[in-house]
């Protein structure tokens, strides 16, 4: 199963994914989710460090070698070409996908409460399904 780097490095992705660790599911899927979470933690750190090193490579620096930013916190560059090259390389990394060891999607019932943000972050690892009705209710419907 694949997830884009741009999703996994979003601030609340890991905490949202971690909520899946509290979901009742098969032992196999619990183990896979736990393994995925550990791998994602490591991967997020690598992607963030890589992004930071690209910024350090291209950004404008002061006399102390620190990255300069404007009053709004936006990083400054010596020229538009360096900024474009930096953004291009960062976007290339963010568009790459990580392959996570999850053999099947996590089932989320249609009546479970989630936010649109959580669904967007987890859309590659969840499947929204109808809750199965007990046999008695199925017979009544006929």
Q: Model-found features: residue ranges?
A:
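A composition-driven surface/loop motif
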Residues: 1-142
